[in-house]
Amino acid sequence: MLQIIQYRKAASLDEAMELLSKNRMNQIIGGMMWLRMQDRTIPVAIDLCDLGLDSIEETEEGFLIGAMTTLRTLETHTGLKQYFGSLFQDAVKDIVGVQFRNTATVGGSLYSRFGFSDILCAFLCLNAEVHLHKQGKVSIEEYAKMGYERDILTHIFVRKEEIKTAFACVRKSATDLPVLNMSIARNNDELRLVVGSRPKRAILYKKTWTNDFESLAKEMAETVPCEDNMRGSKEYREKLVYALTLRLLKQVSEEEVA
């Protein structure tokens, strides 16, 4: 059972950071969708809802996504769809349901960096960076490898690119956590492949485009480190890496990159 001793609505990021630093058990609550299922006591729950972090701002260079932006907003944003196709819609459509996605936040999903995260898998194939209150700007690739530190994720910035993207995953049942997820981004001959739910955190692989899909799929299956867990064996995941790599390569080859 989750118990919260004190609830504080931060008036500024500095105040939120100060509250977070006072006790290692204090917590930024985000959308509270995963947090509420934990059995723990939080001395001070810190809410960022009044700090204007719940919108997506489009600029000439890219999209600045606030950490409190909901997954539903990410899913339905027309600007993101124009530049990145159905990447985000495909990544979030199986995350429980619309009601859940109306509350779950992008920042909470990315900060957690769960191995099964469809959100991390989708962002990792893009030219993106996270903005942290203390540490500043960090590339999404570097952030995916970092340990957990006492900091506040405020924004995610995604640069506009002329790319073709796709997302694929395998689940045992609809809305279940993925057995394996993958994303891809193609910019002419530059290829970025991401494999997540291995079951560890998603990993980015940078490759050169080839029409020999079979060879690249076999290479990925042999390269990606997979492990066993309750949802699937190491061997099963390796076969999924092969199959999903083939599927994604075919998807980004179907149309010319804009």
Please give the residue ranges for each predicted region.
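C-terminal structural segment of proteins
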Residues: 1-258
